């Protein structure tokens, strides 16, 4: 089916959607280059931001309840053979995806001075894929909706994302599934992946199902990726206690452990009778662990407790992790600046309130949904339909810990079997020569445990998390190049995926300025990449020069060969152009003898001159060139000598070429 012009579609539907140009963001205030502290009002990154409707249009031309979702779109720095789009969700429920954009997988971070700084090459997920950060459900982050009209269920939230995407592909038709249907999947269209963390473990499977089940899916969904997600209450509730023991914070003989173990037992008994996502008795487990770790620090005015997002850290009570990461306060200040809001096209009329990380009203409305089953029940059908699923977990998290996420994967039944089998054991995963974690794949499902990472994997392990998502999406950055092609990476016994190494295959190290340095050369990866680019240009130029020289050589040889052939032809028939045959009478007199019996050589020479057109074979080459291209009238005059017969001479104009 041919694609309609987006304006025609909008006209037919009566939807007032702005042109894509109106969403363009030319720059962000105080976005600094890595090597400079000067304000960067413009930058090489292609970026768009703004609002699109989340609910159907009503009679007044506005969406129901005035629901609009805010989005931030970052384009890829390097484009693979098949383009990719990652749609990013944060959790909560009700937490803004600016967490992901500015602290985890986006292109910049806070610089500690109130501005922004670009992340190091290879750390942002938009290196090889476009990323769409989405504030959803309506009311989250910069999104807005009428008061008391918040989204109240997971299916509703999913439908609103699908409605948003239907409008999105009208503004940006290159992302539409219609492109792939029209022109084929090889190189045409865009592969779409849903990704996020925490409570997004509920959002994402529901949204994936809504896309797949849509009568006309707006995008071509290929996979979903959930980090430290809450997806399976039966597998995950209670693993908080196991994590406390695994991390050597408690022992099984401690009083705290025994107390919480009783709560875990009561929780599991409740889970056996319920199919709800959140159960009060089970929520008591984490609350009790937090209370048990809360202490008054000597010399401090308040209390501290465990950071539920990173067990290696503590936080002030009652935040217990809500103040983390440490750049969060600066992010609040930045996103509340009027110049930043203006640059991002924030609607001051409908969203006048200051940005907050998590909207409590949105969260409360979503928690009223007690009928939607846990999202884990949607995964088997998605997997069987061909949608790839990645479950990954930072191993230092407590609230949605790696033990629970891995157990959820192992308990899952799909493709005619349960969990992983012995034929596909977990493999060690290495990035930049360091053990990054474990990797296991079976029947479209992949589980990755990330060593040394917290609840927000991208905060602690940006290079590793990016390598993970690139592998999952099947991008071959050996062909695309870019910074990640410089970082050795492998799973199991496969060869390292790396384009350039130094010092006999050494791995990149971290320099004083934070840049990765190639051993054996002392150069940063950026310097090595620049040298590689120049070498590529040099090699391409050398190849072109060789081709040119070969062509000139062949041309010269052909020219000389042609000239030699012309000389040979002239030696045979002369320059007269046409050879007049001698008469039999003339030939009969061609050989006479003198009275003493000797042959008359003078007569022979005279006869030879007549046969070759009146000139000797020793004529120089220049005369050949003088006439070979000349065209003119026939000259029938007799110029062969006093006694010679008339011959036809070559056509010429009398002028030289």
UniProtKB/Swiss-Prot annotation:
Reactions catalysed, as given in the entry: Preferential release of a C-terminal arginine or lysine residue
Topology versus the membrane: Single-pass type I membrane protein
Cytoplasmic side: 561-657
Alphabetized GO MF terms: serine-type carboxypeptidase activity
Annotated region described as Disordered, given as residue ranges: 584-657
Sorted UniProt keywords: Apoptosis, Carboxypeptidase, Glycoprotein, Golgi apparatus, Hydrolase, Membrane, Protease, Signal, Transmembrane, Transmembrane helix
Gene3D superfamilies (UniProt xref): alpha/beta hydrolase
Pfam families reported in the protein's UniProt record: Peptidase_S10
Domain of life where this protein originates: Eukaryota
One GO term of the biological process aspect: proteolysis
Localization (cell): Golgi apparatus, trans-Golgi network membrane
GO cellular component: membrane; trans-Golgi network
Segments of skewed composition (Polar residues): 584-597
Ranges of compositional bias, category Basic and acidic residues: 603-618
Transmembrane segments: 540-560
Entry annotation: catalytic residues: 198, 397, 455
Glycosylated residues, chain numbering: 432, 444
Catalytic activity, EC: 3.4.16.6
Function: Protease with a carboxypeptidase B-like function involved in the C-terminal processing of the lysine and arginine residues from protein precursors. Promotes cell fusion and is involved in the programmed cell death.
Family, similarity comment: Belongs to the peptidase S10 family.
Protein name: Pheromone-processing carboxypeptidase KEX1
